[in-house]
Amino acid sequence: MEYPISLYYDTEVSDVKTLDLCRGDDDYRKVHIVDDGHRKLVIKYLSNTFSDRRRIEGWFALMNEYRKIGLYCPNVVPNLNGELLHCDTKDGRDYYTYAEEYSIYETAEHIGKDKYKDEQGHDCFTPDVMRSLGKIASAKLDMLDWASAYCLLEPFCAPDTTDEATECAVAFVNYVRDNIPAYLSRAEALLDMFYKRQEDLRKVYHSLPTSCFQADLNDSNILLDSNNNFVGLIDFNLCGKEPILNYAVREALWGISDNRLFGEKDSRLYFYDEELDNLRISLFLENIGYIQETYHFSSSEKDAFPILFRYINSFWWFHIDEIKLIKEDDNKINQLFDWLERQMTRDDIRLP
């Protein structure tokens, strides 16, 4: 029987589906979905720079905490040797194997957007996801001593050298340099402004209250019941300890879904329309309101909010996608640059 399936089954199994999730030599990940007719398991086999025994056992511990607040997370099951986590070494490299029960609920991705979105394009589960975030924030979990993939002001793992926001800001300017150099001086000025906002944030960031979060709330990890209610999560491999304000603000921003804000090829229409951008902020504050039903921001978090917002509401991957879409449209390029400058200088939004 193929390894690592043989760690969990002592007879041949014919119902096996293998997912290759590898991302280059430094990130080896394969998932085997196995069903012998008696039990169905998701066996995960991995080796990468952000997974070791300490971290993986931390994932298990955090899953237990999520269960305590009432969220479903599939149980980790022991292998035939009684191990929850197995390590083998090949060519000096450690490979880890663990298995979970196959989820009794479907992911939002599997259910499909036509089922979980309303007529305006809002995700029906967003309010409950935000409320659960507030519960985890209120728990002030402290069992992990590493940052999540949402980390700011530091890299998440090798070979990263910066946080993801900085990576996006630099990539944006590099694209302008290589493709629309007439705008390079303005792009570089925006990058200088971004670095100033980064230093502003550095002065307050590390003193903010923290908790530990799953840190990967996409529709392939969100579990829904038969009525499309949010019930739980899978995949904790990007989890870690984060300032609550960072995690809450980013999820409140990224949890915005409204058809009026997006055009063809996912173009962000609010870059070019102040009324639509005001709608975006209104929806952001609505999401913050759901979080505040279960978590109360401290005075230090409220004071730090404008500083953090100016940083994380600026450059991200979709700005790079956008500049590629509009590179032939001088008017839109200038509007996008104006939008970025406004986000890094605005002082008109406060936490309720």
Protein language model features and the residues they cover:
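Juxta-kinase regulatory segment immediately upstream of eukaryotic protein kinase catalytic domains
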Residues: 1-18
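Active-site catalytic-loop/activation-segment of kinase and kinase-like phosphoryl-transfer enzymes
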Residues: 149-202
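ATP-binding pocket architecture of kinase catalytic cores
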Residues: 39-144
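Active-site acidic catalytic loop and adjacent metal/ATP-binding pocket
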Residues: 27-38, 42, 196-246
